């Protein structure tokens, strides 16, 4: 069980109990690795990435001292997915028109005419 990687996978957020070495995930229960938008569905500004990372750090700190379980990781992943949705709704994040598939997984894009 020592080499098992715990993970949380949502549509746009992946969290692993691992570190990255040579593009491989290596099990490491002392470290969490965050993968944001692995399918490149959105266009990201550095400030928006930093907001997600900051929220991730807050959520991890809230769970300090608790057992690290699949459930805990899923809660953190779900919260981050909600943060991503809020950023999209606020116009701080937009869909990538060059994405492999335009499925608008978090709702249709907002335009000033419809807002």
From Swiss-Prot:
Protein name listed in UniProt: NAD(P)H-quinone oxidoreductase subunit M, organellar chromatophore
InterPro entries: NdhM
Provenance organism: Paulinella chromatophora
Main location: plastid
Xref: HAMAP family: NDH1_NDH1M
Compartments (UniProt record): Plastid, Organellar chromatophore thylakoid membrane
Complexes and interactors: NDH-1 can be composed of about 15 different subunits; different subcomplexes with different compositions have been identified which probably have different functions.
GO terms assigned for molecular function: oxidoreductase activity, acting on NAD(P)H, quinone or similar compound as acceptor; quinone binding
Enzyme Commission number: 7.1.1.-
Main function: NDH-1 shuttles electrons from an unknown electron donor, via FMN and iron-sulfur (Fe-S) centers, to quinones in the respiratory and/or the photosynthetic chain. The immediate electron acceptor for the enzyme in this species is believed to be plastoquinone. Couples the redox reaction to proton translocation, and thus conserves the redox energy in a proton gradient.
